[in-house]
């Protein structure tokens, strides 16, 4: 069945249904979807600019009592290989990030049952006292629900205290697939899809924004993928809590799901395009070169992405599953230019800091650590 009618409706600004999304997932006309998604991206972003942010992942703890089957990073509470980083180690990592022009810290960890709200607020105040201008784009719904549980607080109360202590925005990690079927199969102890949605809505209530994410490749159905997109779109309609959408593929190596069939870059590009076509209320789509590699990341700029994501001075979670791609600032500039775009460094809230003209390079750069 031709998908031309669905694509035409999307490009003309008509909202797609879940049934439309399923038909797109069933089709192999990926290039057509990419072209339509690119047209929609250009309506949001008519200038030939692709943005990126200079940031670092800081994984402050790997202790986690959620035991997701797909995670190679966590260690059970009490495990000899588990850790909680000292504040001074975290502060040193932030200083190194600022030294190369970084503006964002994506600080995330496991759901550590030994860390109460006081640990997080003390850490954030310590960071902001030393580095008042760094943007803390940190934690996740699962971590916030764990803090609420061990601190006998509501999620909204936790987010309000974190925000007052220095949290600026919250990434939408841990969404994976927002359906009960897949979550029960791959992360039985993790927060429910409703809890994830409610935490992201609560970020807006306390004066912050967040991002929405999606991970495919757990063996979920096309209907589940469409339902995930529907739930994200509904939450955005209600609260406008998301500044961006990021999707990637599950990396099965070194995990409890290592026998799962690995999806292809083509599957990733199709998902990016369908998401852009469906999510008509989210302005920014980030490439996921960290999992997909820089060349596929570059291709995604033709499939609906307007942003290359973060430089990732450090990354530990994806690399624990056997996937390591190292890209510094000047490599990102090169990749964006190869895609026919003008690179521009941005803040976490998508304000442009600097546009790199012609062959202009970053004066300060780094070697990715992990």
Curated annotation (Swiss-Prot):
Positions annotated to bind [4Fe-4S] cluster: 64, 68, 71
Cofactor field: [4Fe-4S] cluster
Catalytic activity: dehypoxanthine futalosine + S-adenosyl-L-methionine = cyclic dehypoxanthinylfutalosinate + 5'-deoxyadenosine + L-methionine + H(+)
Gene3D superfamilies documented for this protein: Aldolase class I
PROSITE patterns: RADICAL_SAM (PS51918)
GO MF entry, a single one: 7,8-didemethyl-8-hydroxy-5-deazariboflavin synthase activity
UniProt keyword S-adenosyl-L-methionine present: yes
A biological process term (GO) from this entry: menaquinone biosynthetic process
Pfam families per record: CofH_C (PF19288), Radical_SAM (PF04055)
Cofactor note: Binds 1 [4Fe-4S] cluster. The cluster is likely coordinated with 3 cysteines and an exchangeable S-adenosyl-L-methionine.
InterPro entries the record matches: Aldolase_TIM, CofH/MnqC-like_C, Cyclic_DHFL_synthase_mqnC, Elp3/MiaA/NifB-like_rSAM, F420, FO_synthase_su2, rSAM
SUPFAM superfamilies xref list: Radical SAM enzymes
Biochemical pathway: Quinol/quinone metabolism; menaquinone biosynthesis
Keyword terms of this UniProt record: 4Fe-4S, Iron, Iron-sulfur, Menaquinone biosynthesis, Metal-binding, Oxidoreductase, S-adenosyl-L-methionine
Superkingdom as given in the UniProt entry: Bacteria
Domain Radical SAM core: start-end pairs: 50-295
EC number(s) recorded for this UniProt protein: 1.21.98.1
EC main group: oxidoreductase
Known role: Radical SAM enzyme that catalyzes the cyclization of dehypoxanthine futalosine (DHFL) into cyclic dehypoxanthine futalosine (CDHFL), a step in the biosynthesis of menaquinone (MK, vitamin K2).
Family: Belongs to the radical SAM superfamily. MqnC family.
Name assigned to this protein: Cyclic dehypoxanthine futalosine synthase
Species of provenance: Halalkalibacterium halodurans (strain ATCC BAA-125 / DSM 18197 / FERM 7344 / JCM 9153 / C-125) (Bacillus halodurans)
């Amino acid at each position: 069945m031709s998908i031309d009618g669905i694509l035409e409706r999307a490009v003309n600004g008509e909202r797609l249904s879940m049934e439309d999304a399923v038909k797109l997932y069933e089709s192999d006309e990926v290039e057509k979807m990419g072209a339509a998604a690119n047209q929609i991206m250009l309506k949001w972003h008519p200038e030939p600019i692709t943005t990126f942010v200079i940031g670092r992942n800081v994984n402050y703890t790997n202790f986690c009592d959620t035991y997701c089957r797909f995670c190679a990073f966590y260690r059970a509470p009490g495990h000899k290989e588990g850790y909680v980083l000292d504040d001074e180690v975290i502060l040193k990592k932030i200083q190194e990030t600022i030294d190369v022009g970084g503006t964002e810290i994506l600080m995330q960890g496991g759901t550590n049952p030994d860390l109460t709200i006081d640990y997080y607020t003390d850490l954030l105040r310590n960071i902001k006292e030393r580095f008042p201008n760094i943007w803390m784009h940190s934690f996740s719904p699962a971590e916030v629900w764990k803090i609420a549980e061990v601190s006998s607080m509501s999620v909204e109360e936790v987010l309000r205290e974190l925000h007052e202590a220095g949290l600026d925005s919250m990434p939408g990690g841990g969404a994976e697939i927002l359906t009960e079927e897949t979550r029960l199969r791959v992360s039985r102890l993790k927060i429910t899809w409703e809890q994830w949605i409610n935490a992201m809505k609560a970020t807006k209530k306390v004066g912050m924004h967040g991002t929405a994410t999606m991970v495919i490749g757990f063996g979920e159905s096309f209907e589940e993928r469409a339902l995930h997109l529907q739930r994200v779109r509904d939450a955005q309609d209600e609260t406008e809590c998301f500044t961006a959408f990021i999707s990637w593929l599950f990396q099965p190596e070194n995990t409890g799901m290592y026998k799962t069939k690995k999806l292809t870059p083509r599957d990733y590009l199709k998902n990016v395009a369908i998401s852009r076509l469906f999510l008509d209320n989210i302005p920014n789509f980030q490439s996921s070169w960290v999992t997909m590699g820089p060349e596929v990341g570059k291709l995604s700029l033709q499939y609906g992405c307007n942003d290359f994501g973060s430089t990732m001075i450090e990354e530990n979670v994806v690399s624990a599953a056997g996937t390591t791609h190292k890209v510094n600032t000047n490599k990102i500039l090169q990749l964006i230019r190869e895609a026919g775009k003008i690179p521009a460094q941005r803040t976490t809230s998508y304000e442009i800091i600097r546009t790199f003209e012609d062959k202009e390079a970053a004066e300060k750069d780094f070697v990715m650590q992990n």
